[in-house]
């Protein structure tokens, strides 16, 4: 089989490594891929949002199955285009990817179908939003409606911060068109849990839960990032809570999308908060999370390609999705200065052991040398029988990844370890 994976980050590297385990897979093409993915797949310089380029490549190379991993191409209709060309895909069509593509859509969906979430207001007019903020409870959460690379959510601790966030998005177009509509919502408290789930639009098979570490600095200080590390499973996500989420959130979401004529097939990511009043949805993503994928897939015992094809074919109910009863920890090594400005182009060295455990995100290959090319450069994952061992081993392996100006949080997994006690 010839496979195509759209995307070029650490998440895609993890997906490709898992897909490679299937003996029927001959070749995997990554569009565009990156310098590290080039060790595991054939990288082709076609951008993830170049839909014409992707479709033409897939047709010319007789691709048997495609996986569209990032949010942008999904929201733009990459799966629709590939399907029209007769190529089966993993991922939702554009009319279902809107669940991530528009926060206003997803909030209204939850309200209409009684899915627990924070109370909210939606604004398309700056003056109205500012008037609302005069009396809104503080802290409050301001979200850009559209895609903003995971950076379009501001937790405003003061009224001034809320006004600044809304003005930045609506008047100063900080996120372009994505911020022309904003959602202002109630600030919720409680542990956060990420749950990725396979779905064929009928059956939902959740993956092992995980805990992300969003802030740039230790002890959750500093700016929000795309994620500095993850552990799985999440100790706060007990069997009782999992059952409740399936009944109150996962199945109702799939049913709601079906009722709206927007059947969702692929990976649906539930960003949850376990509030004193029960689990609530903070956000939906229409794809595998990054860096959640880097801990979830290494624990998957079932064959990934088989499960993906079952979501496409509507046979997920008859397909086993099994995870190892172990723990995983992923530690991100980033360029110092991320998520703001940082220098790139530094050579990366990895020990053999580190390379085998590392998914590459922001790196390019030049004359056989791997050079840093992004903020988050690598993610190094260890799997062990206990969380403490997985954390220790992930850091030990990550020490084998080196480049100038490298930066890691030193406390990935500590919150989870405390929760277990």
Regions found by a protein language model. Give the residues of each.
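Solvent-exposed alpha-helices and their adjacent loops that cap or buttress functional pockets
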Residues: 21, 36-38, 90, 112-114, ...
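ATP-binding N-terminal substructure of ATP-dependent carboxylate-amine bond-forming enzymes
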Residues: 1-94
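A conserved helix-loop-beta module that forms one wall/lid of the active-site cleft
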Residues: 90-152
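Peripheral (often C-terminal) accessory segments that flank ATP-dependent C-N-forming ligase machineries
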Residues: 310-421
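Short acidic-hydrophobic, aromatic-tinged amphipathic segments that line or gate anion-handling sites
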Residues: 43-49, 121-125, 156
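Internal nucleotide-binding/catalytic subdomain
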Residues: 152, 156-291
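Active-site "cap" helix and flanking loop/linker of ATP-utilizing ligase/carboxylase catalytic domains
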Residues: 246-268, 285-353
């Amino acid at each position: 089989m010839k496979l195509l994976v759209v995307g070029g980050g650490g998440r895609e590297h993890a997906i490709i490594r898992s897909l490679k385990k299937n003996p029927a897979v001959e070749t995997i093409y990554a569009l565009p891929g990156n310098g590290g993915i080039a060790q595991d797949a054939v990288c082709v310089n076609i951008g993830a949002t170049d839909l014409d380029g992707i479709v033409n490549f897939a047709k010319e190379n007789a691709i048997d199955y495609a996986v569209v991993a990032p949010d942008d191409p999904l929201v733009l209709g990459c799966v629709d285009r590939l399907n029209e060309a007769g190529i089966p895909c993993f991922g939702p069509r554009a009319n279902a990817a809107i669940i991530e593509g528009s926060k206003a859509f997803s909030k209204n969906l939850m309200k209409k179908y009684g899915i627990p979430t924070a109370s909210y207001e939606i604004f398309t007019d700056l003056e109205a939003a500012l008037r609302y903020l005069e009396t809104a409870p503080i802290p409050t959460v301001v979200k850009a409606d559209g895609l903003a690379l995971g950076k379009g959510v501001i937790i405003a601790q003061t009224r001034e911060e809320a006004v600044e966030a809304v003005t930045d998005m609506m008047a100063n177009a900080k996120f372009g068109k994505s911020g022309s509509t904003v959602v202002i919502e109630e600030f919720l408290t409680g542990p956060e849990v990420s749950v990725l789930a396979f779905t064929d639009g009928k059956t939902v098979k959740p993956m092992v839960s995980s805990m992300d570490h969003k802030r740039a600095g230790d002890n959750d200080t500093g700016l929000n990032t795309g994620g500095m590390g993850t552990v799985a499973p999440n100790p706060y996500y007990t069997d009782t809570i999992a059952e409740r989420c399936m009944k109150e959130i996962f199945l109702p979401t799939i049913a709601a999308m079906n009722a709206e004529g927007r059947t969702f097939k692929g990976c649906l990511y539930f960003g949850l908060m376990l509030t004193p009043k029960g689990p609530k949805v903070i956000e939906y993503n229409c794809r595998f999370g990054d860096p959640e994928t880097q801990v979830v897939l290494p624990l998957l015992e079932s064959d990934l390609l088989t499960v993906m094809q079952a979501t496409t074919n509507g046979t997920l109910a008859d397909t086993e999705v099994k995870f190892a009863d172990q723990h995983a920890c992923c530690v991100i090594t980033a360029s110092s200065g991320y998520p703001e400005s940082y220098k790139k182009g530094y050579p990366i060295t990895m020990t053999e052991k580190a390379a085998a455990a590392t998914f590459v995100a922001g790196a390019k290959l030049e004359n056989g040398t791997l050079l840093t090319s992004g903020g988050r450069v690598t993610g190094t994952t260890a799997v062990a029988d206990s969380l403490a061992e997985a954390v220790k081993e992930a850091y030990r392996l990550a020490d084998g990844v080196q480049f100038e100006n490298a930066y890691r949080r030193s406390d990935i997994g500590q919150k989870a370890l405390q929760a277990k006690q």
